[in-house]
Curated annotation (Swiss-Prot):
Gene that specifies this protein: vpr
An example Gene Ontology CC term for this record: host cell
Alphabetized UniProt keyword annotations: Activator, AIDS, Cell cycle, Host nucleus, Host-virus interaction, Phosphoprotein, Transcription, Transcription regulation, Viral penetration into host nucleus, Virion, Virus entry into host cell
InterPro entries the record matches: RetroV_VpR/X (IPR000012)
Oligomer status and interactors: Interacts with human UNG.
Function text: Stimulates gene expression driven by the HIV-2 LTR. Prevents infected cells from undergoing mitosis and proliferating, by inducing arrest or delay in the G2 phase of the cell cycle. Cell cycle arrest creates a favorable environment for maximizing viral expression and production.
Name of this protein: Protein Vpr
Amino acid sequence: MAERPPEDEAPQREPWDEWVVEVLEELKEEALKHFDPRLLTALGNYIYDRHGDTLEGAGELIRILQRALFIHFRSGCAHSRIGQSRGVL
C-alpha cells in the first residue's frame, strides 16, 4: 500500500481566475513597454468582442501577448538580451 499525504496538508493554490488575471496584468505591463498602447487597446477590444469578459478571452490574450513579446525580443529588442550575440549585454 503506497503512502499518501493527508488531503488537508496539500499546499494551498490560488484560484485559477486570480492567477490568470495576475499573469495578464504582468504581460500587459511588459507589453506597454514595447508596443504602442493604441495597438494593445485594439487587440483587447478585438478579444473582448469575440469572447466577452471570459477566462477563454483572457487565455487567448495571454497567448497572443506572449508570442508577440517573444518575437519582439527574439528579433533584437534593445531592452532584452534574447537574440543578441554572446557577451553583449
